[in-house]
Amino acid sequence: MGVFRFISISLAAVSAANAAQILSMPHAQTVPNSYIVMMKDDTSDDDFKHHQSWLQSTHTHNITRRATIQNAGMRHKYNFNKMKGYSGIFDDETIKDIAKDPKVMFVEPDTIVSVHGKVEQSNVPSWGLARISNPQPGADSYTYDSSAGEGITVYSVDTGVDVNHEDFEGRAIWGSNQVNDGDDRDGSGHGTHTSGTMVGKMYGIAKKAKLVAVKVLGNDGSGPTSGIVAGINWSVEHARQNGGTKKAVMNMSLGGSSSSALNRAAAQAVEQGMFLSVAAGNDNQDAQSSSPASEPSVCTVGSSAEDDSRSSFSNWGPAIDIFAPGSNIVSARPGGGSQSMSGTSMAAPHVAGLAAYLMALEGISGGAVCDRLKELGTSSITDAGPGTPTNVLINNGGAKGGQPNPNPAPAPSPSQPSEPQQPTPSQPGQPGEPFPGEPFPGEPFPGQPFPGESAPAPAPAPMPPTPQHPHTPYPGGDNFDFDSFWKKYFGGEHWRKMFSSFWN
């Protein structure tokens, strides 16, 4: 008996020494008795099933003995890529028992996550679309390639979406409700607004992309971290079964206190090939203290105002990857029509929409998308904030003489914010046809794609700074060198001599 007792005590000591950490969240708003449990990366499917069976019996025993918590037990189960885990409501003794399992990585209290946007006045001009396809603020047209995100699926992880709004043209579907409130609609308006910016016919950037609504926040704009993680899990699995994660974008215009579980889930989605656009937060503080904005593998977005300054509310710091329009943005409203909102919540969907646009246009995916956004952007932001490593504002290539087809859509009018408008050509001419003395819309030299064709993938050429384009060789320019021009674009001695006599 003495030997058995010694062995039991030794095993208990080893178990305690190897117990997983129960993380502390002193500055967060926690959900009482609700926890997120993450398993170690080497946990097999069989190990995970065994742990769940053990949890069920342990939890039942503890609850039966104490009967102190209502509606207790497992709520969400996570299982994608390397990440396995679950969330639920458990008493203190059960949590201690869970932490002792050597397959458990950590236990984290469930915290409240909120949207990063707020409603402002209605019927103000939506300037964001025009800004992302022009070199300077103040433009009133949005120039884009006709591919417009076709073939890409965008996941709106938010408050839900009014998928029947006319701006979505039937391209939006309801996906999942992780709030479990039985209310499959957007009672907040936040998710419909952000989705309109991403894929709407009038207010959207990727006007041909599909949208899937994933509700993780309630009608008050808040919800537990456990539901956010479940929404990420669901989105990744849905993407894998419907076109692939490399043709999927996830927008997360939300955030809360720093969460290892939420950051880990976001990182796993990126590792699977999805592009994640995340709002930096609206507290005018270091975004490093917020999740999922602090996750290095996502594209974290700060907000800009109409004059290209950082929005006064926008978070800043080393976590920021890029800026996008976020002040006074007009977009879709549940039930029809439009409304204006401000926040990094409004900036992130500009990035998500542009990501979908570029993925369709150039065939890129995952982490390469954020890098491409930085390449195409303009160094325009003033007062980016302490420790912020970038002042780049997103652009679709139009600011650098880039690749979009000349197919501009007028920016929404203040007097008719919800009227759909068809894209119209921005100037006359023969885009795609080289002819002497006339620059091409959006590109001052031959190479512009024919209408209806996708633009080429190479990086855009610099936009000439003046109407004369002094450093760009094209017919009719002041510094035009015909020999260099012909050798580069056409070649052939017979044709060179004939056209040389014509132009000279």
Swiss-Prot record:
Q: Domain Peptidase S8 spans what residues?
A: 126-400
Q: What class of enzyme is it?
A: hydrolase
Q: List the EC numbers from the record.
A: 3.4.21.-
| Induction note | Expression is strongly increased during growth on protein-rich medium containing keratin.
Task: Provide the protein's localization.
Answer: Secreted
Regions of compositional bias (Polar residues) in chain numbering: 282-294, 378-394
Stored PROSITE patterns: SUBTILASE, SUBTILASE_SER
Q: How far does the signal peptide extend, from start to end residue?
A: 1-19
Enumerate composition-biased segments (Pro residues).
Answer: 405-449, 457-473
A single Gene Ontology MF term assigned here is:
serine-type endopeptidase activity
Kindly identify the residues recorded as the active site. Answer: 158 (charge relay system), 190 (charge relay system), 345 (charge relay system)
Q: Name one GO cellular component term.
A: extracellular region
Xref: CDD domains: Peptidases_S8_PCSK9_ProteinaseK_like
Q: What is its main location?
A: secreted
Q: Where is the Inhibitor I9 domain?
A: 34-116
Family membership: Belongs to the peptidase S8 family.
Q: What does this protein do?
A: Secreted subtilisin-like serine protease with keratinolytic activity that contributes to pathogenicity.
According to UniProt, the name of this protein is Subtilisin-like protease 1
Q: Which organism is it from?
A: Trichophyton rubrum
The uppermost taxa in this organism's lineage are:
Eukaryota, Fungi, Dikarya, Ascomycota, Pezizomycotina
